[in-house]
Curated annotation (Swiss-Prot):
Catalyzes the reversible oxidation of malate to oxaloacetate. Substrate binds at R83, R89, N121, R152. GO terms for molecular function: L-lactate dehydrogenase activity; L-malate dehydrogenase (NAD+) activity. Its EC number is 1.1.1.37. HAMAP family: Malate_dehydrog_3. SUPFAM superfamilies: LDH C-terminal domain-like, NAD(P)-binding Rossmann-fold domains. This is Malate dehydrogenase. The gene is mdh. GO terms for biological process: lactate metabolic process; tricarboxylic acid cycle. It comes from Roseobacter denitrificans (strain ATCC 33942 / OCh 114). Keywords: NAD, Oxidoreductase, Tricarboxylic acid cycle.
Length: 320
């Protein structure tokens, strides 16, 4: 039986890391696409030459032609401009919207049956636009954000409590940006909710509040440190976790920017929510109950995403 085919649209820092991780996990053969001649070919060859030492079997190739992604089982989209210090994800809207149009048309023409994961920022608006431009089924197009934001939240919590991050469960709702909603009440250490850990004296509410804010600022913190780019290891690892759940029908419960139509009181809208990802794509949106404060924060985040979607429609009339 043929190995799955994974198309990576964009061969920058995230794209190259995605290719390496996909190879190491032997998820399938990898095609790196980029408009920059030589970059995808060079990275593909470099990773392929690591195969004998890393002991993986996967074909790696690079291309500037969408025709070479034909029949891809998974497409992960990282193409676009990355943030620089002082920029918000929203500042990238106009430039990256044009990129999504080109990518969406390329996927529709050559890989219409693929499961598509978008990483390009501003994430929630870009995954919506990518779905519109591609015309693929909503359950086959989603955005990588919640897995990354939750991973950052879990890392900070594990550091605070000095425990294994394997025992920390946490997830984040809402848009991928300053308005994201890390849910303290639903986050646990070995099954113990964070509010109970405050009562037990393991931490303080002030420290938890600081961790929540650091989670919101997680991407900007790395942009500020790198100065010439944005995060790539953690975003790539998060997207691979989603792709693996799809390819292996693991049915993992993972937060991502998914199409919500009825749940959370939303109608036909992409935003970060817990989902089940399996062979059918986003097979289910998990609707949780929120208290008044959580709902207010989620509504604020949804409104921010709606503003970005409206801006996209203002830029490209075909989206209206």
């Amino acid at each position: 039986m043929a190995r799955p085919k994974i198309a990576l649209i964009g061969a920058g820092q995230i794209g190259g890391t995605l290719a390496h991780l996909a190879a190491l996990k032997e998820l399938g053969d990898v095609v790196l696409f980029d408009i920059a001649e030589g970059i995808p070919e060079g990275k593909a060859l470099d990773i392929a030459e690591s195969g004998p030492s890393a002991k993986f079997d996967a074909r790696m190739s690079g291309t500037q032609s969408y025709a070479d992604i034909a029949g891809a089982d998974v497409c992960i989209v990282t193409a676009g401009v990355a943030r620089k210090p002082g920029m918000s994800r929203d500042d990238l809207l106009g430039i990256n919207l044009k990129v999504m149009k080109s990518v969406g048309e390329g996927i529709a023409a050559h890989a219409p049956n693929a499961f598509v994961i978008c990483i390009t920022n501003p994430l929630d608006a870009m995954v919506w636009a990518l779905r519109e431009f591609s015309g693929l089924p909503h359950e086959k197009v989603c955005g990588m954000a919640g897995v990354l934001d939750s991973a950052r939240f879990r890392h900070f919590l594990a550091d605070e409590f000095d425990v294994s991050m394997k025992d920390v469960t946490a997830f984040v709702l809402g848009g991928h940006g300053d308005t994201m909603v890390p849910l303290v009440r639903y986050s646990t250490v070995a099954g113990i909710p964070l509010p109970d850990l405050v009562k037990m004296g393991w931490t303080t509410q002030d420290k938890l509040d600081a961790i929540v804010q650091r989670t919101r600022d997680g991407g900007a913190e790395i942009v500020g440190l790198l100065k010439t780019g944005s995060a790539f290891y953690a975003p790539a690892t998060s997207a691979i976790e989603m792709a693996e759940s799809y390819l292996k029908d693991q049915k993992r419960v993972l937060p991502c920017a998914a199409y919500v139509d009825g749940a959370y009181g939303l109608k036909g809208f992409y935003v970060g929510v817990p989902t089940v990802i399996g062979a059918g794509g986003v097979e289910r949106v998990v609707e949780i109950s929120m208290n008044k404060d959580e709902q207010a924060m989620f509504d604020n985040s949804v409104n921010a995403v709606k503003g970005l979607v409206a801006a996209c429609k203002g830029i490209d009339d075909s989206l209206s």
